[in-house]
């Protein structure tokens, strides 16, 4: 992986299921590993890939309090944030506190939502001036995956009112598809557990 090739070590903190079968962050494990491994940057996936959890505000706040305590920079992968199933709401990581706003690089793209993968149309939001300048400096040294004219127009077009109208219809269809798929798997696939996602269009199966 590119991170490891650049001398970084990846430390995982697996999710755990609560008494209701809902996947949660293991805050005790997160803090232990941050402290013991001297972690200074964290990748925060919201909504979560692959289990499809759409984090509640208190969960994001608690994670960001840990990152603040140990001065950890946060890369918030929010590429699935448009695809929230009915009954749930995405909370942007940068919105939960002023500190979260300033220590987080939030990453987005229309590729998952509007089927534009491959056009290289991702973008990030950075409020912290110092952090933004560092990212711009490093990215200016390479043209790898730079946006092009086609991807720029595709991104602008996706986020027009017509795109949002289409997305509202898509979310209704996906919600119905998820309901059907989860019921079918539970009824026909003995020994396989399925976690009903709150966002994304993926199903997380425990085989």
Cite the ranges covered by each PLM segment.
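Glycine/threonine-rich helix-loop capping motifs at alpha-helix boundaries
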Residues: 139-148
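Conserved glycine-rich beta-strand-loop-beta hairpin in the small C-terminal domain of fold type I
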Residues: 156, 172-182, 193-207
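Structural signature of PLP-dependent enzymes
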Residues: 133-140, 159-182
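Active-site phosphate-binding strand-loop segment of PLP-dependent enzymes
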Residues: 15-89
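Helix-loop "lid/cap" segments that line or gate small-molecule binding pockets
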Residues: 119-127, 152-161
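Substrate-binding/gating loop at the entrance of the active-site cleft, primarily
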Residues: 1-10
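Active-site PLP attachment segment
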Residues: 96-134
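Generic structural signal for small/hydrophobic residues in well-ordered secondary structure
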Residues: 3-4, 42, 49, 77, ...
